[in-house]
Amino acid sequence: MTENVLLVAANTPFNNSLLTYLGEAQKGDLVEVPLGKRVIPGIVLDENASIEGLDQDKVKAIKGPLTEQIKIKDKDLDLYQWMANYYHYPLGQLVWDSLPKILKRPRELKFTQGEGKEFSFTLNEEQRPVFEDIKNKLFSGFSKHLLHGVTGSGKSFVYLSLFKEVLNSGKSVLFLLPEINLTKQFVNLFSQYLNVPIYLYHSDISNSDKYCLWGKVQKLSEPVLIIGVRSSLFLPINNLGLIIVDEEHDASFKQDDRCTYNARDVAVKKASLQRIPIVLGSATPSLETLNSFQSGQGHYHTLNKRMGNSTLPKLELIDERGEDKDEELWPLTNKTVDEIQQALTRNEQVIVFINRLGFSNYLMCRNCGHKFTCPNCTLSLRYYKKKDVLKCQVCELKTPRPSECPDCGNMKLLNRGFGTERIQDILQKK
């Protein structure tokens, strides 16, 4: 039997990872191929490649299939090829990076079965037109929507209503979230009202579940809801009908290592290639997204009111220039501390957000101005009062707090900047 000439994208960091082999395989198959003295994985791009200009006797044969559980379909392969070109990343390596660990004996796949209760809510006068507008475009090919709704406006209930429409039509839904810790609240909500299996896909899911889910979703005949982070974008879902990206502005959708892609943008491309609608949701859309939709590159929907009788909190910006300086309270102001005390008197809770750890940003000699820096990173060492140490935020080097300046011997060392420990000290004294 004559072997086919295969074009394979191998898992290598080479700019041109497309290599020619002989063997029996089909487009989209995952195979093992020899490269030098190594055997590496790859994906078949063409099962009838041209061998013109090559000596067929010198063309090596593939070692065999890597797995029969996973096969990359044409639409998914088109997405990989677009990403490889757009982000300038080797195609074979891109595919391999997105795959789950290949297992020989995967366990049974875990999932949450929805209860399918009747909706206990009705969309309000602001949500209903948004839902109807998107609903009218659900089954008309590719469309792009931005749902710009203030916090508490009920975007989740619009999503849920859209899910039900798509799932009832026999198609599946992919719901993308930026962080793992957001999945539980959505599973609890969606599982009440949707009578379909709900699968999770993120880094806390076992390798066995990931591998099984890849094999399952490409053969789906029944609709499912998949909730996941950016890596779930590559799942080869057979009958996908809708993609929703919640909190589209979140930086966690950007991958900073290996292929540095933005999952939001890749999700839009995936929807375009599969000719299905996509909804981006946010209370604070990114500037590029907002500009794109406001300039007519998609359907722009707004929710400006909170659900029920709840109102938006009152925001007040305190100008420190008009406040009397109190060194004991710095960086807090008298007004801030007074507001905190009043809230506690009313038995209310208070959250103080501080985006710095430790007691101070750095130590400085009062006499000569010497700053204590990390010998490895040359960055300022942050002071932690509770442990009485200086610590580097990059390499995590730790050193006891010095008693004097190494340059001039002065023993008066000043704390500069502030962190959570200093704020805690101030509030405990008050």
Task: Please identify what each model-predicted range represents.
Residues 1-17, 343-346, 358, 366-371:
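Accessory interdomain/linker segments of ATP-dependent helicases and helicase-like nucleic-acid enzymes
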Residues 1-282, 289, 294-310:
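Accessory, non-ATPase domains that flank or precede helicase/AAA+ motor cores in DNA-metabolism machines
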Residues 46, 200-202, 280, 302, ...:
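Structural signal for conserved beta-strand scaffold positions within catalytic alpha/beta enzyme cores
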Residues 70, 279-283, 326-329, 398, ...:
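Hydrophobic alpha-helical scaffolding
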Residues 118-119, 142-152, 252-253, 315-330, ...:
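Glycine-rich phosphate-binding "P-loop"
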Residues 158, 329-334, 339, 388-389, ...:
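Short, flexible helix-loop junctions that flank or precede catalytic/ligand sites
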Residues 270-273, 277-280, 286-366:
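Conserved interdomain linker/interface between the two RecA-like ATPase lobes of SF2 helicase motors
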Residues 345-428:
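Cys/His-rich short segments
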